Every structure is written in C-alpha cells, then in structure tokens.
Amino acid sequence: MKLSRRSFMKANAVAAAAAAAGLSVPGVARAVVGQQEAIKWDKAPCRFCGTGCGVLVGTQQGRVVACQGDPDAPVNRGLNCIKGYFLPKIMYGKDRLTQPMLRMKDGSYHKDGEFTPVSWEQAFDVMEEKFKTSLKEKGPEAIGMFGSGQWTIWEGYAAAKLFKAGFRSNNIDPNARHCMASAVVGFMRTFGMDEPMGCYDDIEQADAFVLWGSNMAEMHPILWSRITNRRLSDPNVKVAVLSTFQHRSFELADNGIVFTPQSDLVILNYIANYIIQNNAVNQDFFTKHVNLRKGATDIGYGLRPTHPLEKAAKNPGSDASEPMSFDEYKAFVAEYTLDKTAEMTGVPKDQLEQLAQLYADPNKRVISYWTMGFNQHTRGVWANNLVYNLHLLTGKISQPGCGPFSLTGQPSACGTAREVGTFSHRLPADMVVTNEKHRDICEKHWQIPAGTIPAKVGLHAVAQDRALKDGKLNVYWVMCNNNMQAGPNINEDRMPGWRDPRNFIIVSDPYPTVSALSADLILPTAMWVEKEGAYGNAERRTQFWRQQIKAPGEAKSDLWQLVQFSRRFKTEEVWPEALLAQKPELRGKTLYDVLFATPAVSKFPLSELKEEQLNDESRELGFYLQKGLFEEYAWFGRGHGHDLAPFDDYHNARGLRWPVVEGKETQWRYSEGNDPYVKAGEGYKFYGKPDGKAVIFALPFEPAAESPDNEYDLWLSTGRVLEHWHTGSMTRRVPELHRAFPEAVVFIHPLDAKARDLRRGDKVKVSSRRGEVISIVETRGRNRPPQGLVYMPFFDAAQLVNNLTLDATDPLSKETDFKKCAVKLAKV
C-alpha cells in the first residue's frame, strides 16, 4: 500500500488530535473491521461545532456503535477531530434522562419539591396550566423561551412559529446570542445580509490567514488541518494569529501577536490607516462598491439602565451613523499611528507592520477568520465592522482565497438561529419583527390574522435573565442548551430568577445538566440521529440526516415536544377577539391545527417514503412533518438571495451552500460569475443594501466594561479546550475525553503564580466582584497567558466560571463579553 501525501497529512492530523487529547483514536475510526457487515451505515453532519463535518454513522441493534469521517464530505474529506471520533458515546451516558421529571411534594408540583418521574401527559398538564395562567394574567410578555444553535432547522422554525405567531410573544432567543449575535449585526450593518460571502474552498487558494480571537487549532481543528496543509505546502503562505494569550494556533503562526484585551479595535484601525498611507486602497473597487459612514460612539455596555456605566453613556445602545467623506475617514484612522498602536496594545511595532503588510499587499489573497474573541466583546459589532473595512478598502472580498469569514461555534447557529430567525428580533431570511412589511409577509404565508406577530422586539438572552429575576417573565422554556452554566453572572442575574417561586422553569435536555437540575420540570430529549434533522454550517452549507435509531425510554425530540404542546391551546385562549374576527374560521381550532397541521405543512404523505426513511414524528402525525415545515420555511428565502434547494435534494447530497439557484450552489456571494444574483457587467453587488454598496464604518477604540485594578488585579478570559464542547454536558460523559481533561484549571503566567506563592497543581480561589470558584493552578501546557491575565475553560460543572463573569454585552448585538472581567487569586 502506498501512502499518498493526502493520506499522510490526514493520518498525521488524526494522530495529532488524538495525541493532543492524550488518548487513542477508537478502533472503528482507524479501520472498521470484524462486524462491519452487520453494521448499517448512513450519513449525518457532526453534532458538535459549526464546521459541519460529515460523518458516517454505524448503527447496530438499535444503537450507534461506530462513527467515522465521511470520505465524500467536502468539508472534512474523511477526517474527524477527536470529539467527532467519539460521537457514539455522547448518547449513552449512564445518567441519560428517559422520562419527564417534575419537582413534587405531597403528590403535586411544588417549587421546592424533589424531582419525581411523571408521564408526558402530567408534564404537559402542568406546563399548560402555567402558560395559560401567565398569558391570562400578564399577557404574552410573561412567557419566554431560550433555544439553541443546536436545534435542527425545523425545530427552530417550529419554536419561532409557535411563540411569535401562536403565543404572540417575541420572547424567544437562542444561545447563539452568546456566540454569533455580534457577527449577525456586523454583517447586517456592513452588507445588509447575514453570513459569510466565502466558503471553505478559500483555504486552498489563500496566500495568508489572519486569525482574530480564534484558536482554530482546538476549536475548529478540521479547518485548521486544511490551513496547516496549505501553510506547509507553500513557504510563501503566511499565518498571523492574534489573541490576548498564546494558544496552540500560535504554533503554526509566522506572526503570533498577543495584545492587551479590548485593543484589537486599535489594531484594526491602525491597519486601515496603514493601507491608506501606503496607497494600497483598491480605488476602482472602493469607488464603485463602498459607502462610508461614521458610527455613534459612547454607546454603553448593555448593563441595566441603573448601572453607573449606562447612566454615564452619552448614546446608550445607539446604532446611529451618518455619511462621511473619504478625507474624513482618512483623518479619523490617521490617529491610529504605529507608535500609538504599539503603546496601547503592547504589540511590538515590527509585528504590527508585518500584519498590516499582509492586507496592504495587492498580490496577497487574505482570509480573516474570527470567532468568540471578536464576538464575545462589548464592541463585538464594531470589531466585525472594522475587519470588513480592511477587505473593502483593498477589494479582497467575494473572490476565491480572500474575504472576511466569521466562524460559528454550534452546528446550526447559522442554519437555525440565524437563517430561521429564532432571535427575539428576527423572522426567517433576515426579516425582522419591527418591520411591518416583514410581519405582513409572514402572516400571509402562515395564513394567520394580520397583526398576530408583535412589532416589539422580545427579550434577548441576558434580558430574559433580568426579567425572570424581576418577576416580569414567569414561564420559561429552555431547550437544547445549558445556560445556567454557560451564561454570565450566574449568582446575581440568573439563579435568583430560576428559583423564584413566581416563576416556572422547563428544561428539555438529554442529561441532568446544571440547568436541568435548577429547573422545575425536566423533559427528556432525543439526541442527534435519534431524530431526523438538518443543520446549517458556517459556510452556508445546509445538511440533512435521517433518523437512524430510536431515543431511549420516553425521550422525545424537541420538535415533537413543541408540536404536541401546541395541541393544548385553542386560538381563543391566545389571540384577542380583534384577530379572530379577521379569520372566524380559525375559532375553536388549536395552535396545532393553525400552525402545524395546515394544508401547506401536511401536504407531503408518508407514501413518498420507504419504511426505513420514516421518522417517529411523521409516523405519529400521519404526514411528513419535517418536509412540510422545511418547504414552508424555504419559501421565504427563494428569490431573495437565501434560496434553499428542494427538501429531497439535501438527503441525496453532502450539503449545499445557499443560495442554491437552478440546482447550483454558490461558493462566493456578491461577485459576478460566482453569484447568480449579480448580473453580467456589475462586477460586485452587495445586494443586501438598496444601492448595492457595502459600508465602511468609522468606529473608535472604547475601553472594556471592567478592567483590573488594585484589588482585582488580573484579566479573566474564558473559553473552551479541544476535548470538551461548551459546558461538557456531552463530552464529559465520554470516558476517554473526560480522562484526557477531567477538570478545569486556571492557566496563569509562571511569574504571576510566583508572585502569589502559587505552584502548578495548587488549589486556588478565583474571585470577582460577583462570585468565586475554586480551581487548580496550571503554569504550563497549551494556553500561555501573558502576565496580568488568566484563562479558564467553562466546561466543568464543578467549577462554574460564570459565577465570575460580568453580564456586560455589546449594546448593539446584546452578546455577552465572556473574555474580559477583573479577578483576583488567593491560595486555598
């Protein structure tokens, strides 16, 4: 057997990922032997991050027994990261939930009762009573839902439809608010449309990669393997990595830059200044395709209105901007000189110049990648806008090998949270609830009365916590996330509301997470291939999978829960008389009848499917629910730049990147010859904007909401590690991954540890103004903070790092800044 170069790279990438985690790859991933004939294989996208790797799932006797990279998947080309190889084991933790659990005392629900098994009928009875009471006494604003970028497309669509049209409440938001909201607002402000214009195929054609606040080596390892291949294949290819601390991605970097927290804004403006001063502006592109605007400043930090920082802000929450000339923009960025930038960021001048030269060189095709370092930022929208500026000044955009690319952290943060519109302000296909025309489009398509969808933006994630604490939000359904562990400022703003006797909290989850154990009712949920699903990844690729096994016990999919619960409400119980008068034929009908059993949704018969293609929900309802929901949803985007292919095409493909027009997917948007919406002769057209032009924004540096001082003298940054995903509710139940990284640690500079009489392995108390945790000192290893900063992962339920974090958000995106708050350390 000959080992090809590709095989060599692939084998080494697998080995590297496994070695990094301190474990070996499962045998089935190396070579599926022995019982191979008895295993049934089918395709699915990976359950974890937003990369969207394709895997082959092996099932036998009703269980997932094997998993391997799908060699026909264009994203990963047969390679998995170490989490992907252990996918089968995430479903079989010993504490998997299999029946509803309600807090009960003396035979009935009680806020302080013990969790007791109940039937679905009993669970829904209690939920129904709580929902109806709140709706009757306080109205739709008293109920809410916190959803997920891990929802399938039709689960998110059903949830949004049920809440916004059925319950008439926009108080539904996804956990993608915590990770991708800044990217969404950044895209909308600059381009008028959401999501990247490029794709992963850019990697093999780029000359330079710049990572802004993104540790791709651990968080997007498959894409990192492709970047590594590209970098090692051509000595002229360069990699720059920017972060507030060193991590594994620095190992490949030609220019590894550690900067002072929040000063990335300074670096971005410096590069724009460098481009202009060195006559590197692509004048032809700039003149034809770009407008300039100056944004409002001093916009606050998304804290409560009574907070001193909010009271001091001149323009709290302002998204305003005004036109400006090129000369005015030139003068604006001219303040960000090399000397000033080096002083404010702590970055050596030669490194700053090297970075700027990558963008300024007209012969270098540059990709900018970023994730949470940019997005989880009190000026995250600005950071997104400022990196777009660099690509718009140079014209390095919407062409193979160059462009700005926001990487997602969840498997369907794009396909579900963003495209479906499960945010509190959004509707499908980039429409918003505040736009009367958009509401009208949805109401007519859904055949519900005009005025059903509220015009008021609902509560975003952090606002939901505050409303629960204040007693304004009283019934709260949490699905497919673990926000009690993942959200900020647990002690002050979340736990009080969850345990308030006025409130009733439902958590749908496969496992007894921190969130589930803090709730009043736990609903057991089907996972991954226990249901039919669809995800949309970071490169606009929509991928489907079939249900391949049944969920254990009485566990049900989120879709089943939403649809079945809708049967409990008649239109008269949720809609005012003025709405019913418009459509009297809807009187007496349930929300199930009006939203999910409509002719549009129920028109696809099960006779279209083979026996092995049926799923549990469709069997129970008698029609192909998933297809009906998808086709109804896809209508919104077709002909409007968000075109999705017909439903059946996705089951036959390894994903398709929208817009899909006349059967052809789109790799690069907004450019002639690549995007079907750009006509011959237009060159580029940013058609999300009325005039087809993108916007360069002039936005300054503004400080973080909280910085170290004499008492709390260290920056805290939080994040993830390779072996665990988010709060670890799945990966910590995989023995091999748990052993590889069993508990969270505090990564700290050796000199900072020495100054506090701390040694590696010591127990340490980490305290902020909001709370404290006990952890373990780590002065070596993969993450190497500079002096003055510590880093902690948030996967460990025994170390709730978000007891420490501040609930400051970007005022425009409402996304939390998990990367910057002040802490102190004390030896235990």
Swiss-Prot record:
Cofactor binding note: Binds 1 [4Fe-4S] cluster. Binds 1 molybdenum-bis(molybdopterin guanine dinucleotide) (Mo-bis-MGD) cofactor per subunit.
Subcellular locations according to the entry: Periplasm
SMART domains tied to this protein: Molybdop_Fe4S4
Pfam families: Molybdop_Fe4S4 (PF04879), Molybdopterin (PF00384), Molydop_binding (PF01568)
EC top class, as a word: oxidoreductase
Major place of residence: periplasm
Start and end residues of each 4Fe-4S Mo/W bis-MGD-type domain: 39-95
Binding-site residues for substrate, renumbered to this chain: 794
Highest rank taxon of the organism: Bacteria
Annotated binding of Mo-bis(molybdopterin guanine dinucleotide), by residue: 83, 150, 175, 179, 212-219, 243-247, 262-264, 372, 376, 482, 508-509, 531, 558, 718-727, 802, 819
Modifications after synthesis and translation: Predicted to be exported by the Tat system. The position of the signal peptide cleavage has not been experimentally proven.
InterPro entries: Asp_de-COase-like_dom_sf, CT_Nitrate-R-NapA-like, MoPterin_dinucl-bd_dom, Mopterin_OxRdtase, Mopterin_OxRdtase_4Fe-4S_dom, MopterinOxRdtase_cofactor_BS, Periplasm_NO3_reductase_lsu, Prok_molybdopt-oxidoreductase
Entry keyword set: 4Fe-4S, Electron transport, Iron, Iron-sulfur, Metal-binding, Molybdenum, Nitrate assimilation, Oxidoreductase, Periplasm, Signal, Transport
The UniProt record lists the keyword Ligase: no
Subunit structure: Component of the periplasmic nitrate reductase NapAB complex composed of NapA and NapB.
Family: Belongs to the prokaryotic molybdopterin-containing oxidoreductase family. NasA/NapA/NarB subfamily.
HAMAP family the UniProt entry points to: Nitrate_reduct_NapA (MF_01630)
Record protein name field: Periplasmic nitrate reductase
Source organism per UniProt: Salmonella schwarzengrund (strain CVM19633)
